[in-house]
UniProtKB/Swiss-Prot annotation:
GO term, biological process aspect, one: translation
CDD domains according to UniProt: Ribosomal_S12
UniProt keyword annotation of DNA-binding present: no
SUPFAM superfamilies: Nucleic acid-binding proteins
3-methylthioaspartic acid PTM positions: 89
A GO-annotated cellular component: small ribosomal subunit
Gene from which this protein is expressed: rpsL
Protein name in the entry: Small ribosomal subunit protein uS12
UniProt KW Magnesium keyword: no
Source organism of this protein record: Geotalea uraniireducens (strain Rf4) (Geobacter uraniireducens)
Length: 123
């Protein structure tokens, strides 16, 4: 515990905010190239095959990112846009791929929450 004199001389050190998506380096999104597209299994109470991709970003950082929605067209060397946002039951996955931009097509036959999945308005 510091004395009052020490606080007057030095003061308190302010806490630094820790970023939840450090690889984006304060950008809202970042572009990258898929190096590996694969499926992985979630943590304990859940069971599924979640689609994920390893992406090398334009700043040289390689991250694991989640591919949302039903079905995708991504493969190695696909150029994708990454946004922040973790997947709770996949450890180490802190980013989402933005559907409907660059090489990633929107989800087919999507009626609700279309903007989140890059789906066009049905006729």
């Amino acid at each position: 515990m510091p004395t009052i004199n020490q606080l007057i001389r030095i003061g308190r050190e302010s806490k630094k905010d820790k970023s939840t998506a450090p690889a984006l380096k304060c950008c809202p999104q970042k572009r990258g190239v898929c190096t590996r597209v694969y499926t992985t299994t979630p943590k304990k109470p859940n069971s599924a095959l979640r689609k994920v991709a390893r992406v090398r970003l334009t700043n040289g950082v390689e991250v694991t990112s989640y591919i949302p929605g039903v079905g995708h067209n991504l493969q190695e060397h696909s150029v994708v846009l990454i946004r922040g946002g973790r997947v709770k039951d996949l450890p180490g996955v802190r980013y989402h791929i933005v559907r409907g931009t660059l090489d990633s097509v929107g989800v087919k036959d999507r009626k609700k929450s279309r903007s989140k999945y890059g789906a066009k308005r049905p006729k």
